[in-house]
Amino acid sequence: MRRSFYASSTENTPMMMTQARVLSTGTTDNGTIRYDEVDETKRWFNRRFCFLTVIGIAVLLLAMVVIVVIVLLLTQLKAANSNAQNAMSSSKVQLEELTRKLSQPLEQLGPTLERLSNMPGFPMGPSPTTQTPPGVPPISPIVTGPNTTPESPRRSPKARYEWKGCQNLGKCELSGYTKPPLVILSLDGFAREYVDRNIVQTLNHIADCGVKADKVYPSYPSKTFPNHYSIVTGLWPESHGITDNSVFDPTISPVLESMKSTKYEKFFEGEPIWSVYKRKTGKKANCLFWVGCAYNNSGYAPDVAPAYNQELPFRNRIDTVVEWLKLPVDERPGLITAYLHEPDNAGHYQVDEEDVDEKLAEIDENLDYLMSRLSEEKLLECINFAILSDHGMQLIDKTYYFQDYLDLKGLITAKGVVGRVYINDTTISVNDVVDKFRCKIDTVKTNTRSDVPTRKHYSRDPRVGEVLLEGRAGVTFYKSKADDYELSGDHGYDYFNPKMHTIFYARGPSFKQNTTISPYQNIQYMNLWMNLLGIEGAVETNGTIGFFDNILTNPPRRDNPTNVIGECPMIAFPSVLKCSGNVSAETLNQLSVKLTNCAFSPTNIPLYSDNHCFQNYCDNSVIVSRKGNDARRAIIEVLSRDEASNPSNFTFLNAKYQSNCPSHIPTGSLTIRQNSQLSSMVDERIDVPNNFLLKVLDPLQAKSMEYLNKFGKMYVISGTATDINHDGIADSNGSVITHIYRIMLICNSTWLLMNPPLCTDSDSMDTLSFIFPITEQSTIDCMSSDDILLDYTATIFDVERISGFQFGIGALSQNQNTIIRRKISTKLW
């Protein structure tokens, strides 16, 4: 066994054999060690030890270097991590600030950033426990595969509404805003029913500090271009020329022109608000995509009106409006009209309601952004701001094609839920076209300009077409299958359809707080705009001045008219002048006594006119023209269910006003209670075609008696009118009767007075009015009696226009009378 060289000689000597000596030559002899041999060994050891020492020191130094490097790296990493966190935090703040301040919002960065913002850890997106600043849009993650994550509830708002609250209402902190600018923002196709989905909560917060409409009726037809132009002119489509989205007028163009792209300014009639404002004040008006802004038909175009660009994000549009409002006072527009094309587009192409709901959520976010920006810029309390819409939306489930029913040669057809036919060939008559449709298609009404209900105000202008088709809700018309857009939703229907109803919200220093106005039609807006801009009455409109007084903080004082209709000139003492029939002398004497007894009793007719007078028949009155040779009459009846019946078969006049009976006594009757002696007045008689008598007049009388029995008392005005050109306005020559009308008033509380009519609670007064064109043939042939009556309802204002007098109750305020006169009835009692 080999021993270690480090063993001592003393220890090892006894174990060595005597013969084993180390010779100087390197051999052993007898156990003796040679010293030269030992020195060599030491030298070898020393050399090896030094080498190992050097290696060890080197390894140690290397280890120390590694440790130092690791420590330095750890220190650097820690510092880098801290810097990174600070940088991320700083970037987040900067990006959030940029989002609020830059005129190019996040939407311009594209859908990718919008979707990334909500990804966990992404610096722009809100963390689960961190609120994002106002104005920053919530952004969804990009989904590259099937989305298995359930959506959040549709009605959970993403907006923050940090601007809401009324604590600073009317307190403008900026200088140069003594006259508040007016901003009108339209949300195309925002139906009244969308409000009830409770998604666009920004509107609720606006109403808390301002005003809202219960609902708004569009003008007929409820299409985008006609209604947007009605909103800024105060005129019905038949009066401002934009009768639909597409219009044919051979005096302007030989083809059906789209109002989206037409080059002809002549289509746009009437004077829009921006023109009136500039003309009357000399101040600036800017327009962002509103219908008509691109056409200078009056000589006063908007100062700024960019070309329409549907791709421009809503945030950019909002920022544009805000930047306009921030301009110096001499550059700032006093009027801004702005347009957003949603949710109309979503409604047209919706697969289900969720598609519209999603767009409503986006609208809420954008409106919240708008209000936040106005608040941040301290503009919110310095401007009058209105949000409104033009129409609603209806799902489509049935389509008819003109070519399936007509030879289209010589005809021009216009698509839509109101199908229109223009006759462009003089050899084709209106009846030729009408006969192809009238009562041929179930639930489709066929009208001509002569029998369109007056309330629609869609017959004055030939641009409406010669024949109009309108089906039930859900029906639409196209020229052919090839022309069918296959829309899932559309609009244009009669405003009776609740899905066509729309919205109005407003706030600002000129508006009351938390106030709701009763329903109205959008032609009323123009008078509101002129009032807010200080130019009230600058142009005539189809609306009524003062309609919005009850939502304004400082409405002007208004009085009722003073030209109450007076009594007709007396030519003799009251007595009965018999004209036809058989009657006893005793009966005539009793009736003469009755006329004498009431002849000088106070009579207050709730009508205003300089051109009419009344003839007193006690509980009845006859309204006639002061001009001679005028066949038009109006009969006022004060009716009670408990009045005794007294049938008669004669006719008479009151000799107090007339000395001669007419040569012809008509057989029809305008009075409701036809079993009384006073119903035998000659002036209440009328001749009408048999079909009209059966389909209109008889059902009207029966329904009126039904109402009298139901409500107990009624105040009724029935009359005849002349409107040969179908413009809804009384003709100057009244020799030919073309229409009949009726106004019925009841009290849902109790009557304070019957003559003139007055309820103990003025808000409980209800009215129902009708105007019927007198025709032998019309679409009524295929309608039920109630459908006919409802279709031909009208406002009192409509009756005023076609009769020539104005209605008003002296005991009511001008605004109360205005609300009654403009009330639209969408159902029978």
Curated annotation (Swiss-Prot):
It is found in: Membrane. Disulfide bonds join 439-782. The keyword Transmembrane applies. Keywords: Disulfide bond, Glycoprotein, Hydrolase, Membrane, Signal-anchor, Transmembrane, Transmembrane helix. The active site is at 224 (nucleophile). Its main location: membrane. It is an enzyme of class 3 (hydrolase). The keyword Glycosyltransferase does not apply. GO terms for cellular component: membrane. It holds the Pfam family Phosphodiest. Its EC number is 3.1.-.-. Glycans are attached at residues 296, 424, 514, 542, 582, 649, 733, 748. Probable phosphodiesterase. This is Ectonucleotide pyrophosphatase/phosphodiesterase C27A7.1. The gene is enpp-1.
